[in-house]
């Protein structure tokens, strides 16, 4: 998975500005969620900030090229499950915080692991329930 590799590389390659961008992207996402927004753009921007911090243009390009598909999937999942959206968003935000924590701690193995888990959980939320 591209994003797992990007998270691992971000934990190693990110400079201070990248770290701030990732944290700010998470804050914007949390603000969107707190205001009852679906936060689709903010969610994508968080993942893009991680990819950019990897300093690997391949990861950034792949993520940018699949943006419409990711946004469609996020919108579909969140709109079809509005009754569960609150609890799901709390869980998703926890997963995002775990990703940020691993990157800030410069732990590539943990960053890769928590990103992979987040993507697996997302797939399960989308198709498994």
Annotated model-derived regions:
Residues 85-104, 108-129:
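C-terminal-biased regions
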Residues 31, 80-84, 103:
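Short amphipathic alpha-helical segments at helix-loop
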Residues 74-82, 86-89:
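Extended hydrophobic/aromatic segments used for targeting, binding, or gating
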Residues 1-77, 95, 110-121:
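Conserved amphipathic alpha-helical segments that form helical-bundle/coiled-coil interaction surfaces
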